[in-house]
UniProtKB/Swiss-Prot annotation:
InterPro entries: Ribosomal_uS11, Ribosomal_uS11_archaeal, Ribosomal_uS11_CS, Ribosomal_uS11_sf. Belongs to the universal ribosomal protein uS11 family. It comes from Caldivirga maquilingensis (strain ATCC 700844 / DSM 13496 / JCM 10307 / IC-167). Part of the 30S ribosomal subunit. This is Small ribosomal subunit protein uS11. One of its GO terms (molecular function) is rRNA binding. Located on the platform of the 30S subunit. One of its GO terms (cellular component) is ribonucleoprotein complex. Keywords: Ribonucleoprotein, Ribosomal protein, RNA-binding, rRNA-binding. GO terms for biological process: translation.
Amino acid sequence: MQQLRKLRWGIAYIYASSNNTMIIITDLTGSETVARVSGGQVVKADRDKPSPYAAMMAAYKAAQIAMARGINAVHVKVRGPGGYGLKVPGPGAVAAIRALARAGMIIGRIEDVTPIPHDTIRPPGGRRGRRV
């Protein structure tokens, strides 16, 4: 007979931009941070921060910390830069979700929470744009 393990849920916030990937795991209310790791903490070179490899290593490290503190299942919220920036998450988002699953965490819902403007916002640089 298969033994059922008790699931303790948390929320994994994955912020994937073109410069870095951050993984933050909180409890279900979102008020207490359990683990917080970025891609820059696990690679040496700055150019490697946004890579899928850095996101994978950061997600694995965050999952180990969270599982040591008792959280073994997460709902994932993926976020890109949004606003006047890119509306799609960076290259590390999918790799981070895959690494969370491979680390032994149970994945619940996956949701995109990128901030999308409903009319528009004024881009930086003024009326004539950025002069180079």
